[in-house]
Amino acid sequence: MKRILLAAFFISNILYSQEKIIDTVQGTKQNLDEVIVKGIRAKFSSPISYSNIYKEKLKNKNLGQDLPILLNFLPSVVTTSDAGAGIGYTGIRVRGVSPQSTNITINGIPFNDPESMGTFWVNLPDFTSSVQSLQLQRGIGTSTNGSGAFGASINILTDNISQTPYAEISSSFGSFNTRKNTIKFSTGKINDVFEFSGRFSKIDSDGYIDRAFSDLKSYFIQGTYLKGSTLIKAISFAGHEKTYQSWYGLTMDQLKENRRQNPYTYENEIDNYKPVS
C-alpha cells in the first residue's frame, strides 16, 4: 500500500512540472477608447425608470430640430415648439411635470438657469451633433442637483475622443424653408497624446407659425490631452439665436380662421441672444 501511494505522489509531481505559462499579450500594446464614469447615471439594478440614447440613434433623427423634439418618442415625454417646427424655442415635459423640474446636466455640470431652473434649448442649436450619449430618468433619479430633478433628469455626455482624423459636411432641408448646415472635424490622436475636434452649425427656418423665423448659429470646440491614466478635456460651446417671438396663444375663433396666426404687438419683435459656455 505504501508503494502505491509513493508512486502516485511521484507521478503527480512529474505532471505538474510539465506545465508551461504562455503570456499571449507580452510585448503588445492595446489602445482603448476613453471611458467616462458618471455617478449620476442610473444602472440596470437601479430602482429608476430611465432610457439610454446613443449617438447612432440620435444621428438618424438629427435633421435640425432641437434635442427635446428628438426625444419625443420616449415614454412619458411631451415636447413643445413655439414656432411649430421644432426649431427655436422648444420645451420638454416628462410625466407632465413642469420643465423647471427637469434637471439637465452636460458632462455632469448643471445647465439649468440657476434662478428660474429653466433650460433654454434655443441657445444650443444643433447641439445633438456633439452628443455621444444621454440618459433620461423619469421621476426623481440619481441627480445631485436638488429640486431641479423632481420631474426628471437628462444627463448628456459630449463626443468622445476620435482616434483617427476626419472632416464631415452635412446639410438637410425640410418644411417651412428649414435648412441645417453642419461642419465637423477632428485631428485624431496627435503624437498619441492630443486631439482637437469641433463643430460649426447654421440653422434657418421660417417656422409653421406666421413670421416665427429662426436664425441660429452655434459652435462646439474640444481639446483633449490623454496620456496613461490622465485625461484632460477643455470644452467651449456657444450659440447665437435670432428668433421672432411666437409664444402668444389664440382664441378658438382665431384657430378656426387661421391656425398659423401670430398676434402682432410691435414691429420687429425679435429675440437676439448670444450666451457663451
Task: Please place each PLM-identified region on the residue numbering.
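Bacterial Sec-dependent N-terminal signal peptides
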Residues: M1-I22, L32
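Short, glycine-/polar-rich solvent-exposed loops and beta-turns at beta-strand/coil boundaries
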Residues: T28, V77-G88, I109, E115, ...
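Transmembrane beta-strand segments of Gram-negative outer membrane beta-barrel proteins
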Residues: Q30-E34, V131-L136, A152, T158-F173, ...
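N-terminal periplasmic "start-of-domain" segments of outer-membrane beta-barrel proteins
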Residues: N31-G64, G91
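Extracytoplasmic beta-strand/coil segments of soluble accessory domains associated
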Residues: P68-P110, Q132
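Outer-membrane beta-barrel architecture
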Residues: I69, R93, Q135, N155, ...
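Short acidic/polar hinge/loop motifs at secondary-structure boundaries
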Residues: P110-R138, L157
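Transmembrane beta-barrel wall of Gram-negative outer-membrane proteins
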Residues: Y166, F173-D204, I209-E257, P275
